[in-house]
């Protein structure tokens, strides 16, 4: 995206030129649980066009939440960026986020991807997708998450460890959609089908599917997109090319999100940055290089186009937070290690 286009976006969100030119000592401090160099470029361009310096601190989501709790009102954080509904909902429940009253931000973010109380707002979308090694199983035989619990997949399924927040949110999603009893039976069915020990990460799970150690797996879509695009090297690119990604119908969609810290000292600057990041141009700027989906639309990369479109299920991000704790209990009681 050219700087002139970004400047138009900043003007559209109401940043007065007199207050955005370099030389004005304005800044916004961001605590980010996202770890992408491409995010830094988006912040840099924002600073160049507004004169608002972005000071960035990166750590895991859990670490950042604990830091905010420890710092209290003395925190220097203005914005917190987190991945997954569980983390952003947790930050809100802990009273770490301040509501933002902005009609523009609400217009930017569909209701299902923002907090009903305006404490956080989605920036990008990620699908918890199913991947298949077509040499071991017919991809057309799997269309929904429910299919992962079918007995004919016994010894063929690979899953990430229970402590992973992405799978916790997937189970929470199914509790909302299908009810606790059905979700419990589904989890038990998947655990019975597991082949390998539970994996520590999506990347290693994808490699196992490519190597034929697993026939089926569950991963966030962008991990496979990056590997197929060559982002992790030629060997991974070659290994993963045959893997087929299935968008379950309907699909569990999660987000990365931003909220203004309750302790924010630079509120106007924080709102300006969040307004931009949630705008069509801002969301696309963050999502594009990481192969995530913007808030609206399905991206422009060849990898995402090859995955096809998806139909999100009817569960809102805030609903996931309400069932997360029960999801973890069900996973533990069902033998998901």
Give residue ranges: language-model regions.
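Bacterial N-terminal signal peptides
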Residues: 4-19
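Sec/Tat signal peptide C-region and signal peptidase I cleavage site
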Residues: 19-25
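Early extracytoplasmic/lumenal segment of secretory-pathway proteins
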Residues: 25-90, 337
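Extracytoplasmic ligand-binding site segments that recognize negatively charged/polar headgroups
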Residues: 33, 37, 59, 76-213, ...
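Periplasmic-binding protein-like
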Residues: 126, 155-163, 187-191, 196-199, 237-262, 276-300
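A bilobed periplasmic-binding-protein/Venus flytrap-type ligand-binding module shared by bacterial periplasmic
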Residues: 129-136, 253-266, 285-286
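An extracytoplasmic/periplasmic, membrane-proximal ligand-sensing/linker region
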Residues: 181-183, 292-337
């Amino acid at each position: 995206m050219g700087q002139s286009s970004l400047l138009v976006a900043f003007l559209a969100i109401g940043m007065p030129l007199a207050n955005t030119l370099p030389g004005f000592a304005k800044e916004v401090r961001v605590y980010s649980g996202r770890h992408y160099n491409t995010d830094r470029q988006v912040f840099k361009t924002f600073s160049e066009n507004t004169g608002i310096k972005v000071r960035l601190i990166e750590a895991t989501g859990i670490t950042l939440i604990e830091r905010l709790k420890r710092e209290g009102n003395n925190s220097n954080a203005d914005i917190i960026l987190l991945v997954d509904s569980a983390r952003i909902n947790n930050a809100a429940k802990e009273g770490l986020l301040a509501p933002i009253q902005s009609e523009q931000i609400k217009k930017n973010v569909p209701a299902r991807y923002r907090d009903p109380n305006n404490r956080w707002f989605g920036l990008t979308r990620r699908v918890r997708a199913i991947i298949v090694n077509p040499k071991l199983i017919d991809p057309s035989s799997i269309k929904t998450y429910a299919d992962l619990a079918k007995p004919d997949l016994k010894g063929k399924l690979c899953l990430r460890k229970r402590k992973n927040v992405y799978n916790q949110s997937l189970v929470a999603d199914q509790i909302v959609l299908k009810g606790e009893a059905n979700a419990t039976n589904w989890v038990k069915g998947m655990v019975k089908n597991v082949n390998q020990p539970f994996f520590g990460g999506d990347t290693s799970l994808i490699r196992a599917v490519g190597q034929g150690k697993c026939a089926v797996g569950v991963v966030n879509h962008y991990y496979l997109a990056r590997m197929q695009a060559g982002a992790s090297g030629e060997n991974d690119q070659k290994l993963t090319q045959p893997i087929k990604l299935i968008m379950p119908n309907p699909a569990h969609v999660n987000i990365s999100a931003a909220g203004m810290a309750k302790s924010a000292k630079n509120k106007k600057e924080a709102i300006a940055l969040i307004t931009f990041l949630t705008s069509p141009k801002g969301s696309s700027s963050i999502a594009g290089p990481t192969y995530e989906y913007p808030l609206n639309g399905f991206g422009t990369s060849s990898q995402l186009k090859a995955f096809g479109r998806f139909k999100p299920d009817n569960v809102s991000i805030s609903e996931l937070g309400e069932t997360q704790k029960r999801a973890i209990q069900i996973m533990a009681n069902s033998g998901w290690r």
